């Protein structure tokens, strides 16, 4: 087996990235309209996308596929208006996820869960503007949804909550990975 990415690897990567993103958006879009849910949005994304990601891992046998998925996910998030901070974080946490998966020979269940949890931290990129560019974020939210919505978002996103957002994404990614693994096992035994 060649270590280089082939056309079939890139096709799988593209299909699973789209599946991962669409499933995540199905959760994120309705929840994102309710400001009080924004702090847990990344965690819920990581929970529900654990299913397609674990399915994706059945196809990943080559280094770099998770990194590329992270970059593409960040790019797609940027194109939907959530800022492009997900791209560099997708590259960093995708690479770390790839390294973890490779250290387990792409077969270790524990490394798959840890790799997914680390990979999922790319989602923190969508929160960076809310924490570090507060005035610009408020103006963007106000222009799109009104000043009242913008005020409510900023009220539920104090700077200290970034620690909870990061921890929530990581922990819920573990649960999402377990959910994905359980679904895969149930499909195998049908």
Feature annotation, model-predicted:
Residues 16-20, 45, 49, 53, ...:
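Alpha-helical transmembrane segments in multi-pass membrane proteins
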Residues 188-190:
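Conserved small/polar residues in nucleotide/adenosyl-binding loops
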Residues 28-34, 73-101:
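Interfacial aromatic-anchored transmembrane helix boundaries in multi-pass membrane proteins
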Residues 7-16, 41, 45, 64-69, ...:
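Alpha-helical transmembrane segments of integral membrane proteins
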Residues 22, 90-128, 177:
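Short helix-perturbing small/polar motifs within transmembrane alpha-helices
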Residues 38, 113-185:
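Membrane-embedded alpha-helical hairpins and interfacial helices in multi-pass inner-membrane proteins
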Residues 2-68:
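Hydrophobic transmembrane alpha-helices
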Residues 17-25, 72-80, 118-128:
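Aromatic-anchored segments of alpha-helical transmembrane domains
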């Amino acid at each position: 087996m060649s270590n280089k990415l082939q056309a079939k690897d890139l096709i799988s990567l593209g299909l699973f990235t789209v599946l991962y993103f669409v499933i995540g958006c199905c959760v994120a879009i309705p929840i994102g309209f309710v400001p009080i849910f924004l702090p847990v949005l990344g965690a819920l994304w990581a929970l529900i996308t654990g299913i397609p990601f674990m399915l994706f891992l059945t196809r990943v046998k080559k280094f770099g596929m998770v990194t590329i998925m992270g970059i593409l996910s960040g790019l797609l998030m940027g194109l939907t208006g959530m800022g492009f901070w997900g791209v560099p974080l997708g590259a960093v946490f995708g690479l770390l996820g790839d390294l973890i998966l490779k250290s387990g020979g792409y077969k270790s269940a524990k490394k798959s869960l840890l790799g997914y949890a680390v990979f999922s931290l790319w989602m923190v990129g969508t929160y960076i503007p809310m924490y570090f560019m507060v005035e610009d974020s408020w103006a963007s939210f106000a222009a799109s949804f009104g000043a009242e919505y913008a005020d409510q978002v900023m009220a539920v996103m104090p700077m200290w909550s970034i620690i909870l957002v990061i921890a929530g994404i990581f922990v819920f990614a573990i649960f999402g990975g377990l959910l994905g693994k359980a679904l895969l096992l149930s499909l195998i035994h049908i």
